Amino acid sequence: MSKIIGIDLGTTNSCVTVLEGDEPKVIQNPEGSRTTPSVVAFKNGETQVGEVAKRQAITNPNTVQSIKRHMGTDYKVDIEGKSYTPQEISAMILQNLKNTAESYLGEKVDKAVITVPAYFNDAERQATKDAGKIAGLEVERIINEPTAAALAYGLDKTDKDEKVLVFDLGGGTFDVSILELGDGVFEVLSTAGDNKLGGDDFDQVIIDYLVAEFKKENGVDLSQDKMALQRLKDAAEKAKKDLSGVSQTQISLPFISAGENGPLHLEVNLTRSKFEELSDSLIRRTMEPTRQAMKDAGLTNSDIDEVILVGGSTRIPAVQEAVKKEIGKEPNKGVNPDEVVAMGAAIQGGVITGDVKDVVLLDVTPLSLGIEILGGRMNTLIERNTTIPTSKSQIYSTAVDNQPSVDVHVLQGERPMAADNKTLGRFQLTDIPPAERGKPQIEVTFDIDKNGIVNVTAKDLGTNKEQRITIQSSSSLSDEEIDRMVKDAEVNAEADKKRREEVDLRNEADSLVFQVEKTLTDLGENIGEEDKKSAEEKKDALKTALEGQDIEDIKSKKEELEKVIQELSAKVYEQAAQQQQQAQGANAGQNNDSTVEDAEFKEVKDDDKK
């Protein structure tokens, strides 16, 4: 079976891994980094992903960041006259990671396990799966990030029985999961979280503070300046990271704006205590889901054996301190918070291929599932934290006499009223025979698969007529849309390849022109006038071709110049060889000269010197 790669598709950074033997290995990207920024930029028809896209975000408005926050919604990004869905942008990041894995493995990769926040709903999970498909990946499994982290942490501890709390604060999402580990079984007991809380929010409180300070000092509102905001975002992210290691940091942004008297500069000294004050409400927001997960698992602090911190934002000292205070236990710092999730995904890939044995993963659904009933209430069929895959059925009936059809409104959430929960989908069961209300027997069945994706069936037990749907939210893509996006991705990949080849060809041709000019100068009088003229003509022809857009013309002119320079080099080499032979002949003649005399010498002993 071909390799299944593990991918942590993050809000801020992404990571790709593969199982080598029985150990997960993080694959470095072409820049040598173990994580890749989840950033996509568009410039002159070219798509850039990762570090190169992030570097030019300040000057390029067509740069997309933190797209994960929009997964499962109908959000669109309009760039250069074209609209992109979050699935398409995510697919570009996945395609980049896929290429990195293929370069490392030296073989085609078409299967992956992709991680998602535990608190992702059905629409967000389906969108992630669609993104994988667009990128040319068969998504073998969608796995929850805290579960993946526990898998990586506990793989070599299968002989222990432990209850582990995974606190996962990433770039844009927050999850907390509690798992029980023992005898190779990884069972999720509960999960809770907030999909709108992460490192981006910690950056934002610093940005807001800098904007307020600058406005107070200079009367200029930087929040209205896009380029200034991007510079502030980069500076805030750097300051946040700095304050994990030092107690204060200097934020210096020269020429950030201009006033009546000339350029304005931003200079702010930010202390760790000030940052903690600014971000206090965010840290407090992480505590409620933590308490909820503990309550749902039926555990007390003394039951928790280990606390694992996952996600780059858990490096913030105030976050670590808050977790320690809440659980009463020092967090385990033996795992890399940026890589552990992707490593767990690779292990899950190994479980699927059979390379990892005696490991069983029992995950849960993060939110309750049900349907709307009379009075606009939600009737729950599957409670949150139910182990998946699972199936649950319930009998319903009609609300009025002779009702010919029933509308099934599928919901996900914890609120009692249907309107307060998320609509996953709607469908209709028709042709119900006329009967008094309450008589027809309508069986509604919910199925949740191993990826946490929902299927719903409604069946009239009187006629055995059945209606079944896989939940499609308003943001879900049809098969036709996915196929079109797959083709677009393939075409773009081919176009990007051609563009790279064109750039390489132009660079090689440019280098050849420089090399020929240098060679002609170095040879000077040692080259015939005719040969020199031929080389000059071919060189000028290539320079002219480089000014145009005809790639084939550049290629042929380059080949012609290469041929001339090879012939020229051969002639110069022959001349040099002849000159060397003549020089050796002259030296040999000098060695046979009759004027050479033998010298006599007399040995002088030490005694003779006295």
Swiss-Prot record:
An annotated Gene Ontology molecular function: unfolded protein binding
Domain of life, source organism: Bacteria
Presence of the UniProt keyword Methyltransferase in the record: no
Keyword hit for Phosphoprotein: yes
Residues found modified as Phosphothreonine: 173
Transmembrane segments: none
Region described as Disordered: spans on this chain: 525-544, 576-610
Bias-annotated ranges (Low complexity): 576-592
Role summary: Acts as a chaperone.
Name of the protein: Chaperone protein DnaK
Source species of the chain: Staphylococcus aureus (strain NCTC 8325 / PS 47)
